[in-house]
Amino acid sequence: MKTARAAVVAALAALALGATPSSPPVRVLVYTFTYTNFTTETIHDSGINAPAFHAPVSGVAESRAADSDLGTITVEVLRVQPDTGLIVSVAEDAHGHRSARPATCVVYGNTNVICDPDVRVNTEELSLLRLRGSNFVDTNQIDAKNHWRVDQSGNRMSDVADFSIDKNQDGMLKISSTRILRETDAIGFVSTTNGTISYDWGRLVPTSVVDDETIRQPGSLDRYSTVRTQTSLTLIRDSAAAKTP
């Protein structure tokens, strides 16, 4: 992991000095994306604090907000690290307000992504980058039921993702996924993401991704929020169909 962080630092230092890349990107991938987000704030009222001249009232009050966008995401593969990590640049061109300037990241087959902390990387960009590692589908990790698990839990966070290959047609894989991200303290949030992935095993690249994430976040007493985010991505251009960095 230190190697990955050092690679990001080195790449950012070169950009800061105005350095021009000595060679073009190894590979350029362009995806279309759609993004929708629904937030619901729920308040449970017991009626205990109602004024004396009113009868106690109990119930549930909800407020909702929605957001959406669409556009393209471009991933440039800059080089491959000795530890198999890929140094990439990712940028988003949205029709609405979610456009994001290029960010330098290192991606691994175990879904780990390390990006420049000073540049915003959107949810839909991360959904793609998590699957961009060269050995994302690793035969050494797949069990007899065509399933594998990635556990990246830490001291305060449980992060477990399960992947299952539902169909393999001449190297074109249909993969279902479930990721549960949970804070381990009593008031932490819980994120559950169900997804489907179309993956070209020959080119080592996802060709389409659909994620449906629900986050439940406790607030103050009798209050919590639910955020549902749906993203879809479809590969529309691959500059290196014959090369698989």
Region roles according to the model:
Residues 1, 16-18, 154:
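Short, flexible coil/linker elements and helix-boundary hinge sites characteristic
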Residues 1-8:
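Bacterial N-terminal signal peptides that target proteins for export
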Residues 9-20:
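Hydrophobic h-region of N-terminal signal peptides that target proteins for export
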Residues 20-245:
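Signature of exported/secreted
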